[in-house]
């Protein structure tokens, strides 16, 4: 891989790596290598879901994908933004880079992987910069951090008489 990584630890592909919040939790607990849930051409199969259920016994339904390709892509873009923001704000990485890697997992045949929708999925993960969803999430971050304000006043006897004036003057100033 051409990317830097802090530790070779992280979740293997599975249902737990298909949702953004699970990827974020794994990151916060030290995961840095994320093998994303395997996606495939047949993203609308009707199978028992969740694919893995272990309430009293465990089973796994193969050839299953709980989210469509577009839903999977959206989850990975959300996670990507969240991890970058967390790292930038809280400096989790000691590297000059992000220190984590997303690794795609695709299946299950070459013919399936070569289909138009799978190829689009792969190419959009390789370079998301022109994808509308990536641009939308990038634009969500607002420049205005606070649009409202609360003015506090001392409540001694003299100030109580002038609170009305103070509110007017502070409101006009802001």
Provide a role label for each language-model segment.
Residues 1, 13-174:
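Active-site entrance/lid segments in N-terminal catalytic domains of soluble metabolic enzymes
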Residues 3-10:
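Short, basic, glycine/proline-bearing loop/turn elements
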């Amino acid at each position: 891989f051409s990317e830097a990584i802090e530790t070779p630890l992280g979740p293997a592909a599975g249902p737990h790596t298909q949702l953004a919040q699970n990827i974020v939790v794994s990151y916060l607990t030290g995961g840095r290598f994320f093998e994303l849930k395997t996606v495939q051409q047949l993203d609308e199969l009707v199978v028992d879901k969740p694919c893995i259920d272990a309430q009293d016994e465990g089973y796994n339904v193969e050839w299953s994908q709980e989210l469509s390709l577009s839903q999977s892509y959206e989850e990975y873009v959300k996670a990507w933004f969240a991890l970058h923001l967390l790292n930038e704000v809280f400096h989790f990485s000691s590297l000059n880079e992000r220190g984590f890697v997303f690794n795609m997992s695709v299946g299950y045949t070459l013919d399936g992987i070569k289909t138009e929708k799978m190829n689009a999925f792969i190419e959009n993960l390789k370079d998301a910069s022109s994808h509308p969803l990536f641009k939308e999430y990038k634009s969500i971050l607002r420049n205005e951090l606070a649009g409202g304000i609360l003015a506090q006043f001392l409540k001694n006897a003299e100030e109580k008489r002038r609170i009305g004036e103070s509110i007017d003057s502070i409101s006009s100033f802001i």
